[in-house]
Amino acid sequence: MIKKVFRRFSSSLMIALVALFSVSCAYNSKRIDPATVYGGSNNSTYSRISDDNTPSYSQVPDDSTRNSSKSLAKKINLTDKITYPIVSVTNNINPADIKERLSKTVTVMMVGDILLHMPIEETCQQEDGSYDFSSLFANTSDIISSADLALVNQEVIIGGEELGISGYPCFNAPYPIADALVDSGFDVICHATNHALDKGSRGIINTLNYWRTAYPDIITLGIYDNEEDSKDITVVTVNDIKIAILNYTYGTNGIPIPKSMPYCVETLDKDTVIADLDLAEEIADFTIVCPHWGTEYVLHHTSYQENWSKIFLEHGADLVIGTHPHVIEDIEFYHEDGHDMLCYYSIGNFVSWTSSSGKGVLNRVVGGIADVTIKKDFEGKVYIESYDIIPTVCHLEPVTNGVSVYPLELYTEELALQNKISKQDSSFTLDNCNALVQDVWGGSCEMKFPETE
């Protein structure tokens, strides 16, 4: 693993250097020029297995191959060029100010399931037969694109029209949903879900081919069309913080893994998960796990999820953001042997339109955007500085306002009355949406950890 020069400075050495510069500058009455340090690597993948038992390293394509509407070159530190702030050195230097200036932060956001039931597909289909899914994210894209690193759980496979567009129970989405995800600001697409094999191996191949062709800079996780890629874990560098991101599903709805592609879906296999976490602990500063787990429509995490969260904690995971239950679940903070881990057990559906009716359907259109700030302090220690949850509601009104997700705080009584889900669940009201959030999450408020010493 390539080390960056500036990381080798200890706090005591840095303070000594600052003191030395102070004396020199006071004597010469000169201003210190900014220091620029180069070195390191781009976004990287590291192999679980190599001939000499060391991580393998590969570099992502250069910027000339990138054609996303939102290039990661602006967000993920592709040059690894670290420029220190200009500091006028005097005899009255405040070390705390220098430490704060040299610290780094990364804002990570993630949304839950993009579950494209047929009424959504039909609403987003244009008169000429093409698809436009931009309305789904029209009221949240500003939030999503503000993150340094934005993740989404793409619940259904994106196999394209050649495999037949379909909804429940075997989903398949057209390619334009990928366009809408990128245009809305997402950088990382989690594909390890129970619907990953709804269209067999062909669905996975089509999905990955489209991502590689249309958006080669977008990071996809959880599905593979070749064995070599399946041996890797993904590590991205954002603002000089190396972040490993792992994605697994509990299963594939009983659809067997193809014998010709036994590696095609990342599942919650204990040995594999532990090996990935241990490798991430060696090569990354911070590890995010995105498990597709739990029991559908249950508003609190299960013992199955808790058992897995203990494994994640024991092997160094720092942040867990769960999906699959199709409803929101509790958020827990764990501490063991000096290690902290934040766990969002389920952030619910982001986009969905179930055909079910009756009490509880309301719960399936309320979700949340996980919002976490990661900090790397002056001494190189990386930890969660603060976290938040931004409640959302999926508005379903094909004729007038279409299908779109709103932050709950911007949702109105008028919109709630127009939401078609109220025809399927008479308890759907704005007040009841807020009550659900209050019951499960205690409302939407920013939560801060005490700063790590």
Predicted segments with their positions:
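Bacterial N-terminal signal peptides that target proteins for export
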Residues: 2-13
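Generic alpha-helix initiation/capping and coil-helix boundary signal
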Residues: 12-15, 277
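Acidic, metal/ion-coordinating pockets
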Residues: 27-34, 38-39, 57-58, 62, ...
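Short extracytoplasmic/periplasmic juxtamembrane "stem" segments immediately C-terminal to an N-terminal membrane anchor
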Residues: 40-48
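C-terminal motif of bacterial Sec signal peptides marking the signal peptidase cleavage site
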Residues: 23-24
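Basic polycationic patches enriched in arginine
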Residues: 7-8, 48, 66
